[in-house]
Amino acid sequence: MVHWEKHEGELSVVGVGAGSNDIWGVNHLGHIYHWDGHKWHKVDGELTNISVGHDGEVWGVNKNHNIYRLDRSNNKWTQIPGELVQVSVGSHHHVWGVNHLDHIYKWDHHHNKWDKIDGALTNVSVGKDGTVYGVNRGHQIYRWDGSKVDLVLGELVQIHVSDAEKIVGVNHLDHIYRLKHGKDWEKLDGELTWVSVGHHGEVWGVNKLHHIYKATL
């Protein structure tokens, strides 16, 4: 049983970093916001999707599928080669994404290039431990085993991985689920269109009205 608390602001995508004092999101206008534990700060730039890792690494993509990485020392965005529609950051070492053709990519931070992964996904998420899950156009769920993607029981349209023990997602009916013991999906109360889980089980999400909610697993 989780207790959802409504949070101030409006977003369409939200991401949890090291904790509830490092929350990033974008709204339906592409505006970027950072919650520091006390208030929302508007950040320069425009993005349609954003993700933050446990180490504070922030990446995003814009409506033209351009990819950006934030330098948090000066709050400036640096463009990264390639094109994606969604990006996921577990940490500096773990960045994945998908493009408009459902192609899957893994960032090689040693050589600053994208490696294409076999398969087709519309949404992907990587945790700080390198755990990767994703969903495809048919709402099927897949897990990366280090060399290939394997089908997982269940149906979702969006999934978020903090680590192997903390995985949440939503389906096409806005129902919210958490993965227990790596195999059982537990339905949570509430309705959300996007959900994100942090290292300590803090969950943030948004609904179809762009309202923001938070809870703890």
Swiss-Prot record:
The keyword Electron transport does not apply. It comes from the Eukaryota. The gene is TECA. The keyword Membrane applies. This is Tectonin-1. Keywords: Cytoplasmic vesicle, Lectin, Membrane, Repeat. It is found in: Cell surface; Cytoplasmic vesicle membrane. Probably involved in bacterial recognition. May be a lectin that function as part of a transmembrane signaling complex during phagocytosis. GO terms for molecular function: carbohydrate binding. SMART domains: TECPR (SM00706). Residues 2-217 are annotated as: 6 X approximate tandem repeats. InterPro entries: Beta-propeller_rpt_TECPR, Tectonin_beta-propeller. The lineage of its organism: Eukaryota, Amoebozoa, Evosea, Eumycetozoa, Myxogastria. PANTHER family: DYSFERLIN-RELATED (PTHR23250), FISH-EGG LECTIN-LIKE ISOFORM X1-RELATED (PTHR23250:SF3). One of its GO terms (cellular component) is cytoplasmic vesicle membrane. Transmembrane segments: none annotated. Pfam families: Tectonin. Belongs to the tectonin family. SUPFAM superfamilies: Calcium-dependent phosphotriesterase (SSF63829). Sequence repeats lie at residues 2-37, 38-74, 75-111, 112-146, 147-182, 183-217.
